[in-house]
Amino acid sequence: MSATEIAVEAAGWGGAALILLAYLLLSLGRLTGQSPLYQWMNVAGAAGFVVNGWWHGAIPSAVLNVIWMLIGGIALWRILARRAASEVPDQGPAQ
């Protein structure tokens, strides 16, 4: 097995582990769907599946995981934007 093949398989198995761990932590109440860590785990896990699926010619799986990444990325962006907006100090009334 070449180094590339090993990296592709590691990406797939690592992606699977991340997505399963994210779901386990969500199900146990250790993370919420609004947790940046939960969303990052899903985005990174899906990226591993995209690499593995594309390499093996599993295009439907790769496309599904690109969409999964987009959903997670958008959710993460919204979570972080909300968090940043809530940290802006109140300027008070204009003088």
PLM features: residue spans?
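Structural signature of hydrophobic alpha-helical transmembrane segments
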Residues: 5-17, 63-69
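C-terminal structural segments of small proteins and small subunits
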Residues: 59-87
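Alpha-helical transmembrane segments of multipass membrane proteins
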Residues: 20-28, 47-54
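Helix-coil boundary and interhelical linker segments in multi-pass alpha-helical membrane proteins
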Residues: 1-8, 54-59
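Short, charged juxtamembrane terminal tails flanking transmembrane helices
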Residues: 85-95
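Hydrophobic alpha-helical membrane segments
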Residues: 38-48
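Short, amphipathic, aromatic/basic-enriched membrane-interface segments that mark the entry/exit
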Residues: 28-39
